[in-house]
Design a protein with these regions (language model features):
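Gly-rich Lys/Arg/Thr-decorated short loops/hinges at beta-loop-alpha junctions or inter-strand turns
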Residues: 95-97, 149-163, 284
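Short, well-structured beta-strand-loop connectors
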Residues: 38-51, 70
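Hydrophobic alpha-helical positions that pack around
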Residues: 188-299, 305-312, 320
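Short, small-residue-biased leader/transition segments that mark boundaries at the very start
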Residues: 2-9
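Acidic, glycine-anchored pre-beta loop/turn
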Residues: 7, 37-43, 75
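Short beta-strand-turn/beta-hairpin segments enriched in glycine/proline and small hydrophobics
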Residues: 11-30, 51, 60-62
């Protein structure tokens, strides 16, 4: 089977904070962010270190506390040299504005415009892989009207279980995030699409959704590439995106389930996007795991936390398909 999810541990582990972090300025689709710190500046966890570089761009925040070592290029996973902010880590001091408690905050009194601004300030981007700046997606062109929000919790990519794990651990927070997204685009209906190979997530999310107005969990047959935006819209609301048209032309605003959780954290907890759950897996690893990892953590560190690579490892790759 290509699914491979049986290899992953059913809990997410907090990855160790790196000794040095390299935070890319172009983590998202669109213009790279512009640095607002310089060598020698002291930063905390959650400090804004770069502003959006254009309309389609995203703010970047420090995932660590310490001192800016340099702003230089680093070779990214695609093999290209990209600008990044390098930080020497000292301690783990967070910005005081971030609510670090685990208390669930359900009520949101902000207006749609205030929600979108808070999401933009927090640097939230789509966490399904494309990293499209979320605030842009929540402000469609005037010619289009949103009718519903669709949450992509399909995770059809073989071996990945990060979204699955997130739903099992943070179903309530995700549901509040979905409600906030609904308010942001002024709709009263949301659908959460989950494939049938995650029955525990479907059961839990359905139970939690029952106490939130207008949110419906939609079980879907297991089919690749159902996690694609256009395919998901068709599967959930039976509307096709015409060739060359935007997905919003169907009335749907699609967001990843990880993005919904990040929106909850940004709007309700004042927490910018500086960490995410990531799956590190494969038959070469002694202990495949899901990690809650700070952005800028070297992949080598996560691989070593899984037991390291044997000498006969063929390749280290991203998604299979």
């Amino acid at each position: 089977s290509l699914v491979g999810s049986e290899m992953c541990i059913r809990d997410s582990i907090k990855a160790e904070i790196p000794a040095k972090a390299a935070i890319l300025l172009g983590q998202h689709i669109g213009a790279p962010a512009k640095p607002i710190v310089a060598k020698g500046d002291v930063v905390k966890v959650g400090t804004k270190i770069a502003e959006p570089g254009g309309f389609v761009s995203a703010a970047i925040h420090s995932s660590v506390s310490g001192k800016v070592a340099k702003i230089d290029t680093i070779v990214d996973a695609s093999g290209y040299a990209k600008p990044a902010i390098f930080i020497d880590v000292e301690g783990d001091e967070w910005e005081e504005s971030i609510d670090r408690s685990e208390t669930l905050v359900k009520e949101c009194s902000l207006t749609s415009e205030e929600i979108v601004k808070k999401i933009a300030d927090a640097g939230i981007v789509g966490l399904g892989g494309a990293c499209f700046p979320t605030q842009v997606k929540l402000c469609p062109p005037p010619a289009f009207k949103a009718e519903c929000v669709i949450i992509n919790a399909v995770e059809c990519e073989p071996y990945l279980t990060a979204d699955h794990q997130l739903m099992l651990e943070h179903a309530e927070e995700i549901m509040v995030g979905v409600s906030i997204l609904m308010k942001a685009v002024k709709v009263n209906k949301a659908f959460i699409g989950i494939e049938n190979n995650k029955p525990d997530a479907i059961q839990l999310m359905t139970k939690v959704a029952s106490s939130y107005a207008g949110i419906e969990v939609v079980p879907l047959k297991v089919q690749y590439p159902q996690g694609g935006e256009k395919q998901l819209i068709d599967a959930v609301i039976s509307r096709q995106v015409a060739a060359g048209a935007l997905p919003i032309s169907t009335g749907a605003v699609v967001q990843n389930v990880g993005t919904a959780f990040a929106v909850y954290q940004a709007v309700q907890k004042n927490k910018p996007l500086f960490e995410r759950v990531i799956t590190v897996t494969g038959k070469s690893l002694a202990k495949p795991s899901n990690f809650l990892a700070r952005i800028g953590t070297p992949m080598k560190q996560l691989i070593e936390a899984c037991g390291g690579l044997p000498e006969d490892t063929g390749k280290i790759i991203g998604c299979l398909l």
